[in-house]
Design a protein with these regions (language model features):
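Extended catalytic cores of very large enzyme megasubunits
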Residues: 1-136
Length: 136
């Protein structure tokens, strides 16, 4: 595996600011939440195009299993510029990210059968949450 380029926050922010036509909030949010990072906070994507390429690469890997699956470039064109497909936040950060373990879901529903407002009910809900987030 070839080493990835590590960017500073300022490098990614400036490149993203240009990508988002000067929208400071969009650039800050993208770098802070969605740019590929390792568990030490090192940034490996300069702009959302890098993220879209990562997503397209991973989705194309799955598509290759099907007779008429889409190619990486076809998927990238749908994602590029947030024009046709805009993934939710957790998938944008997590798909193709082999540096951190994270959820690809933005929402979980935890059951509330019985008496949820009791020690036993609270412990059962905690146990369900641990099971949802456990990684081995």
């Amino acid at each position: 595996m070839t080493p990835k380029t590590i960017y500073t926050y300022d490098q990614a922010y400036e490149a993203s600011l240009k990508y988002f036509d000067g929208d400071e909030l969009a650039a800050q949010v993208w770098v802070s939440k969605y740019a590929l990072k390792d568990s030490d906070g090192n940034i490996f994507e300069l702009t959302p195009d890098d993220m879209h390429r990562r997503l397209a690469r991973e989705l194309a890997r799955i598509e290759a299993r099907y007779p008429e699956g889409m190619t990486e470039d076809e998927i990238f064109e749908l994602l590029r510029g947030f024009k046709y497909v805009v993934p939710q936040g957790s998938p944008m950060a997590g798909i193709g990210n082999d540096m951190q373990v994270g959820s690809l879901s933005n929402c979980f529903v935890v059951g509330l059968d019985g008496k949820p407002d009791s020690y036993g009910g609270i412990m059962r809900i905690d146990q369900e949450q641990v099971c949802l987030l456990y990684t081995s």
